[in-house]
């Protein structure tokens, strides 16, 4: 940290342009108004594709100064938030008007959540299954009921009011998006003032946001959940505002602290924090009534997070000559072997939003995958852990979202390299040095992929062969040649024992996934130790293989986006181009865009195996029923350890055996999943028509169809064109992923709703 002389400091100001862009509905009504070429209108059918491809590519618009692009992004953020608020409002509205929330709240272990009732127009009423409590509807797996209970929502009217609040917020966001682009648009220096931005985001969004949530948890969620856990009916519990306005209600539940506007904070400032130990706890483990984390633990967590981030929001130097400067930190950050280190990165990240976005997407994607793993190992909401369909859905959802964001990070990294990279700024710094030894990086990564691929598949094929020959004693398994994941087992053991030393007052381990007892709620397993064996060791190395291949493709795309041995001037061809002519041993599918295209398939590959592993492992070794004497019966009876050792086992005992429910769903409330399963297979197959396509064949076909139209004098004025190679690939990968994801969705849900 440095303290600078006042004359060196440039004062931070909020500077805006007034009325920079007129609000013109007439202009917006003209398709392609943002681009001179597109605004002329269509000559050929390619125009409509370009319209969609470029509408959000602000760099290509007619006015594309850095300032204007920054303003458009800023404004679009508000539009995005408006869409999110409308979407959330719809969720809450369904909860208010079409759900069995109150019935679920009264009996969450037997009643299933439902917030959608289908109108029986031509017999669709069959989809409204009996979810318990006398309610018929579609079982939902979003986890919203559990979240609402954790928030302290006790009736449908509260959901209705919140839904209206969501629409009000959406309106405010739309207004803000318009206002900050058309009326008062910030100047470029405001967008580039990173210290103020960090301070506001850290202290404001994360710090005060967490503090607000902690306050809500303490004053509303905790008392309401304490009463619900004790068996008090929701209708007999005081309303949220009563707990806030009436201190005696809180004193009855949490007598240690004196409740009142001023009295309540005295223990905080006199360091008598023990007074808060009724509701700011450090118990560890799960609440045995609900199978979720102790809400008093999560309130404590959010309060601690708030304190950390509010302090963090005072770290950076703005108008007071004290604190860190981002540029100074980056330029001082160099090691003995890294040349100029991080020099130049400040300029890069303040002038290239693609570079900034690439980092943010990679980080948020990784975070989403971390969230996926915490949702089952440390289920945050009441009765979430025993709602197996919701657990499976939340894991799958957060894995896929994470995968898409990480691929997006590579996409924008490559766009940065092509459009924004400045060789003058990046001289012998980390970025330059990585690019200069990219051949070593990529060839090593390639070797790792080959090694992992052959060895991990080799182990499976060995097992398939030995099982076919009737030689189980020669297989890699827990009962023959063991390949135990000893490091993973050591880490599990370490995490089970460590809190005894690091958090001696905690009552239970951090997560029962690592070790400890079985937590059962309503006769179902909420969480229990997840034992790892040879089958997990094998599939783990398949995960390692597929993830490394995904990284290889994406990283190669970024590092070779500007140039390669075959195409030294690749940067001039742009982010996406189909080929660079014949000869030279092949120049097709080498653009930055093509690497993203190929990376998406491997991302899908990787995550399919991850969610299959999770689904089968949990059904086999975790999820199931608990008898009064404590005996656990798992859904598939622990068959993972022996069946998942061979490729045939995965095909027969997972895919085929567990598809029985979706294939046999016709005539039941799950029949929609049967139709989706079929339809999504069709969408997936349709994608192959675009991926294995010959563009010339289609263009020829189109020409002969146009000839026929000309003969009949009904030819269109806009010339039809076959899809370009890039367009075909884009349509192909979109349908491939949509078909694959919807197929998996139908397969998973039909199965787990039937047996879970």
UniProtKB/Swiss-Prot annotation:
EC number(s) per entry: 1.97.1.12
Residues where chlorophyll a' binds: 681
Cofactor: how bound:
PSI electron transfer chain: 5 chlorophyll a, 1 chlorophyll a', 2 phylloquinones and 3 4Fe-4S clusters. PSI core antenna: 90 chlorophyll a, 22 carotenoids, 3 phospholipids and 1 galactolipid. P700 is a chlorophyll a/chlorophyll a' dimer, A0 is one or more chlorophyll a, A1 is one or both phylloquinones and FX is a shared 4Fe-4S iron-sulfur center.
Q: What is its main location?
A: membrane
The UniProt record lists the keyword Iron:
yes
Task: Show the InterPro entries listed in the entry.
Answer: PSI_PsaA (IPR006243), PSI_PsaA/B (IPR001280), PSI_PsaA/B_CS (IPR020586), PSI_PsaA/B_sf (IPR036408)
Transmembrane region(s): 73-96, 159-182, 198-222, 298-316, 353-376, 392-418, 440-462, 537-555, 595-616, 670-692, 730-750
Protein topology in the membrane: Multi-pass membrane protein
Q: Where in the cell is it found?
A: Cellular thylakoid membrane
- Catalytic activity line of the entry: reduced [plastocyanin] + hnu + oxidized [2Fe-2S]-[ferredoxin] = oxidized [plastocyanin] + reduced [2Fe-2S]-[ferredoxin]
* UniProt KW keywords: 4Fe-4S, Chlorophyll, Chromophore, Electron transport, Iron, Iron-sulfur, Magnesium, Membrane, Metal-binding, Oxidoreductase, Photosynthesis, Photosystem I, Thylakoid, Transmembrane, Transmembrane helix, Transport
Binding residues annotated for phylloquinone, in chain numbering: 698
Q: What class of enzyme is it?
A: oxidoreductase
Give one GO molecular function term.
oxidoreductase activity
Which residues does [4Fe-4S] cluster bind? 579, 588
Give a GO biological-process term: photosynthesis
Q: What does this protein do?
A: PsaA and PsaB bind P700, the primary electron donor of photosystem I (PSI), as well as the electron acceptors A0, A1 and FX. PSI is a plastocyanin/cytochrome c6-ferredoxin oxidoreductase, converting photonic excitation into a charge separation, which transfers an electron from the donor P700 chlorophyll pair to the spectroscopically characterized acceptors A0, A1, FX, FA and FB in turn. Oxidized P700 is reduced on the lumenal side of the thylakoid membrane by plastocyanin or cytochrome c6.
Quaternary structure and partners? The PsaA/B heterodimer binds the P700 chlorophyll special pair and subsequent electron acceptors. PSI consists of a core antenna complex that captures photons, and an electron transfer chain that converts photonic excitation into a charge separation. The cyanobacterial PSI reaction center is composed of one copy each of PsaA,B,C,D,E,F,I,J,K,L,M and X, and forms trimeric complexes.
Family to which the UniProt record says this protein belongs: Belongs to the PsaA/PsaB family.
What is the designated name of this protein?
Answer: Photosystem I P700 chlorophyll a apoprotein A1
What's the name of its gene?
Answer: psaA
